[in-house]
Amino acid sequence: MVFSSLVFLCVFFPLQMLVYYLAKGIEARNTVLILFSLVFYAWGEPFFIVLLLFMCFVDWAVSQGIYKYRGTGKSKAFLVLGCVIDLGLLAFFKYTVFILTETQSWFGFPSVVPKIALPIGISFYTFQLLSYMVDVYRQEVPAQPKFRRLLLYVSLFHQCIAGPIVRYKDVSEQILCRHVDSADMRNGINRFVSGLAKKVLLANVCGSIASRTILSGAAADQAANLPTLENASALTLWLGCFAYALQIYLDFSAYSDMAIGMGLMVGFRYKENFNYPYLANSITDFWRRWHMSLSSFFRDYVYIPLGGNRKGKPRQALNLLIVWFLTGMWHGAGWNFILWGLYYFVFLALEKFLIPGLQRLPAFFAHLYTLVVVFFGWVLFYFTDFTQGIVVLKGLFGLNGNPLINLEGRTMVLNYVFFLAVAVLACTPLPRMLYHKITSSTNGAAIALGTVLEYALPVAGLVFSISYLVGDSYNPFLYLQF
């Protein structure tokens, strides 16, 4: 089940909200959230609910030992035990097939590589559990004495399977006591619907454009008369890569919007996960704005404990290399993800050590540099097959013997130019700024317009999104695969 499915929008979520507000008292409401979260998670993968419960129980038990023996060697031993179990399970499910496949390719064994399904959300909830145990060890929060409360934190369907990666210390008090007023409910609904519209009306269409131009297969669907990657014009490939860059931001930020909105509706206040990353003026700035919960996790639980910026430039560079290798691996078990992480390490290291003068560049050129680096980074990220990725990188400049511009490319650009302009605007704060300017104005006409927009936009967004979904096929969020 995904947030943008009809069964979720029309059955699951309304039923959850109804039962939640019929329940009396915080413990009863927490129980409602736990039960619905477990149903949500088990909907597509009933078996892996056992894994989620097991990891949560083990870490709950381990955290009791960490807290009981705080300040002693036993506390660290409990922490190491919990981390080994969590990371061991994550590595088994996420990287075993990759490692065995590479071993088979290089050395001829094993003869058969087993098929191991990746549990949905394991990368996200594992990091949440790790952050909880480390924070207990650091005595930033006490261990949660009640298992069901930790289970609520880990399994809450708003953010369990695709983030944001929520810190226990940020929601520990909200688990015990929450209040929702009319403004919270209104803001939550607006945020949820805006995320839904962003996903269904923008991200999905961008994905459709990308799939028509840079399909992950070696050749496009010939039945649809689409070109092969080798023969596609440079203009067509630029269009497809640009559409994918828009899709991955709109899709992932839409999920975060919906999660934050649903949290507000029941009193949870999750931190923002995106801050208009395509407005960044450096790669360093980009990663302060993109998937902020993941970036801050690696900063606080890997980079700083390794020494951060405190032990000289060679050590800083090594720490940075480790973090970005792990960032690439976190996103997927594939050489392209590792290369993508190392690609960003190179540019971040250049900015940090060799070209700090980048900050003195005129804003336009700094922004252009950032967009170019990010654009080619998404090409590396998209293609799990290096051969296809190289074909596309060459094709972007006509180095495959492909035309730079052809009729098909011009036609596709003309067909999608208006839509892509709207999608680009959605990647900026301009729509939100305009909305707030209108709704906060003291001008009579603006007040009337603001009142209409405040109620009409969410309704219109919901109606158009559901109408689109009625005739659409399954449309999962991109980050569910990580």
Question: Over which residues does each language-model region extend?
Answer:
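Membrane-embedded transmembrane alpha-helical bundles that form the catalytic cores
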Residues: 1-481
